[in-house]
Amino acid sequence: MAGAIGTFSGLALGPATARADVPTPRAQGWQAVPAPGSTPAAQLRRVDAAGPRLAWAVGEEGRAGPSQGRALAMLWNGSAWTKTDLAHLGHTRLLDVAGTCSAAAWSVGQPVGTGSALLRWDGTTWREATFPGAGETNTRLNSVAVDSERRVWMCGSRGGAAGLLYGDGGGEVWRWLEPLPVASANLYRVVVRSPDEVWVGGDQSNGGGWSGLVARWDGAWTVLPPVAGLRLSIADLHAAGPDDVWAVGTEAGIGGPPGRPGNPALCHWDGTAWTRVEAGFTVGSLGGIAGDAQGRLAWVSGWNYQDQSRSTYLRRDGDAWTVVRGPAGAAPAPYLNDVTSVPGTGGFWSVGMTSPTPAPPTEAYTERLDA
């Protein structure tokens, strides 16, 4: 199991004078990357990369007080983030994104009306796609992933039952799989380990609150025991195998008045039981988890309420976790929602917002770690 938690300051190295024949080294540690063009308040909820010159990030913009915002989608072209046009679609936010190439990506979100929306990127624009349950008030799509055969997996619910929506890579044939055999369950994250093994995370009612939920689909459902907690939701997970699963999330408002920030939850399944591991800080949240190019667990993105001057990460070092801080002065109080690896490199992206409050002047925010 995990050992002691250490700390490391994510300071970047400044420029140095070099001979003309010696390449200037890349900056070390996490670096802020501008994500211009969004209307405050804005945030990026999820990010996915197909390579060093192609990534997508989605969220919302234009929030002001209790009013709903507008969906936000950004595209990385290898040198800059660009806001993509969603004016022809009526959506209040996008919740997740997954892509494979410059002409193929998928996103799920919330329209102005009822139900959930499924969007497809064709290399030029986002367009709505139809699926079983589209437009129904009791249908929700919360997360999307694409496997190595470019088949699309989404988790959510239909008719009050949580489950998976599965589609071929062309987006022509969709079907809901057998419902998850858990009552009062919500699924917030889907992760593909292989085309035949898909994991989901979320929460389930425990009578007085809710516990963390993790399950595996490999042609049939295997539901792991609940992750114990009073009001605990799983935001993301990394499965190295049936007996080696890490899950992250937040236990909401424990030990304080209403509105108190939650507690970060870092949990490990060893095939027999869940173990809660100290996250290195006690008040805040953990939102994203990412493996490296070899599939080994590498990074967790978080938010440390007790020190908001920089972004906060957990880095996996062998059997131990290390707290790593992002760049200084990049944002007033950066809040990270997600982290993902960059295929073909040893790099990573993270996304979120410039402060933990989704109200003006908060803006969309991204950081990158180069190999």
Regions found by a protein language model. Give the residues of each.
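N-terminal export signals
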Residues: 1-17
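Residue-level hotspots at or immediately adjacent to binding/recognition sites across diverse folds
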Residues: 10, 19-371
